[in-house]
């Protein structure tokens, strides 16, 4: 963990990516459940 100055740590990227993926999946399933996903 030496070369972290001026860079974004990998665990931050992984956490943000995981939250975004979970959020997108949640929005997709919510849209499909409420009937909005069929228009996509």
Curated annotation (Swiss-Prot):
Which key words are in the record?
Answer: Chloroplast, Membrane, Photosynthesis, Photosystem II, Plastid, Reaction center, Thylakoid, Transmembrane, Transmembrane helix
Record-given protein name: Photosystem II reaction center protein J
Looking up InterPro entries in the UniProt record yields: PSII_PsbJ (IPR002682), PSII_PsbJ_sf (IPR037267)
Query: How is it placed in the membrane, per its record?
Result: Single-pass membrane protein
Q: How does it assemble?
A: PSII is composed of 1 copy each of membrane proteins PsbA, PsbB, PsbC, PsbD, PsbE, PsbF, PsbH, PsbI, PsbJ, PsbK, PsbL, PsbM, PsbT, PsbX, PsbY, PsbZ, Psb30/Ycf12, at least 3 peripheral proteins of the oxygen-evolving complex and a large number of cofactors. It forms dimeric complexes.
Where does the UniProt annotation locate this protein? Plastid, Chloroplast thylakoid membrane
Q: Which organism does this record belong to? A: Arabidopsis thaliana
Coiled-coil region: none
Listed under GO cellular component are:
chloroplast thylakoid membrane; photosystem II reaction center
Which Pfam families has this protein been placed in? PsbJ (PF01788)
Indicate yes or no for the key word Thylakoid. yes
Primary residence: plastid
Q: Describe the family membership recorded for this protein in Swiss-Prot or TrEMBL.
A: Belongs to the PsbJ family.
Task: Share an example GO biological-process annotation for this protein.
Answer: photosynthesis
Do you know which PANTHER family this protein is assigned to? PHOTOSYSTEM II REACTION CENTER PROTEIN J
Q: Which gene encodes it?
A: psbJ
Which cysteines bridge via disulfide bonds?
Answer: none
Q: Where are the transmembrane segments?
A: 8-28
Q: What's its job?
A: One of the components of the core complex of photosystem II (PSII). PSII is a light-driven water:plastoquinone oxidoreductase that uses light energy to abstract electrons from H(2)O, generating O(2) and a proton gradient subsequently used for ATP formation. It consists of a core antenna complex that captures photons, and an electron transfer chain that converts photonic excitation into a charge separation.
């Amino acid at each position: 963990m030496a070369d972290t100055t001026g860079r974004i740590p990998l665990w931050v990227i992984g956490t943000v990516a995981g939250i975004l993926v979970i959020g997108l999946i949640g929005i997709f399933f919510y849209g499909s459940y409420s009937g909005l996903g069929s228009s996509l």
